[in-house]
Design a protein with these regions (language model features):
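N-terminal strand-loop element at the rim of the active site
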Residues: 7-14, 21-72, 80-81
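A short, histidine- and acid-enriched strand-loop-helix "catalytic/donor-clamping" loop
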Residues: 96-99, 111-127, 141
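Histidine-centered beta-alpha loop that forms part of the nucleotide-sugar donor binding/catalytic region
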Residues: 8, 93-94, 116-120, 165-167
Length: 182
């Protein structure tokens, strides 16, 4: 299975999400899955299987400064790389984050798994409710790295259908497996 991992944060700037994305990519590659990480990089990419999407711009988000790549050239690189790689599935980390993650959800070049890391519902999510719900509806499967992140992933702002979140995730995972077996 060809797997793409999209990280919104520059991989050359240390951070928890970046470390998790790179660790997941290594584990998937060790299991024999061709895996590429698509992310901003300020300098040379950390591994040969990383597709750099350009430099990051320090961006205020959730009370801190995040190294994101919201510029048009990064979005175009992402679209081109996703098309060229022909992934079977793409795991988008922080799927509602500005820049390459939102672009991945809009373009949806393959089934999407959204991994939520952030906790709490931001004012932007509330004020952009219809857009946030539409973007979340593009995800085929949602997962969270913590209980707090799970609350965000399952909040009414993000829920695009009325269902118990675990039943929804279980059905989504089963469907992804069935689609992959075809």
């Amino acid at each position: 299975m060809r797997i793409g991992l999209v990280c919104p944060y520059s991989l050359t700037i240390p951070g928890g999400v970046q470390a998790q994305v790179l660790g997941l990519a290594r584990a998937l590659r060790d299991k024999g899955h061709p895996t590429r990480v698509l992310a901003p990089c300020d300098g040379p990419p950390p591994d040969a299987w990383v597709t750099p999407l350009g430099n990051s711009i320090p961006t205020a988000a959730n009370g801190s400064v995040a190294p994101l790549a919201p510029d048009l050239s990064a979005q175009l690189r992402l679209i081109r790389a996703a098309r060229d790689e022909d992934f079977d599935v793409i795991n988008v980390h922080e799927p509602l984050g500005p820049g390459v993650c939102i672009t991945t959800c809009v373009v949806k070049p393959a089934p999407l798994v959204g991994t939520f890391h952030a906790a709490g519902v931001s004012g932007a999510y509330k004020s952009l409710g219809p857009l946030v719900r539409w973007l979340a509806g593009r995800l085929d499967l949602r997962c969270a790295v913590s209980d707090d992140a799970e609350l965000l992933a399952s909040t009414k702002q993000l829920r695009h259908q009325v269902a118990a979140r675990h039943a929804f995730w279980q059905r989504s995972a089963q469907q992804l497996r069935r689609d992959h077996q075809r």
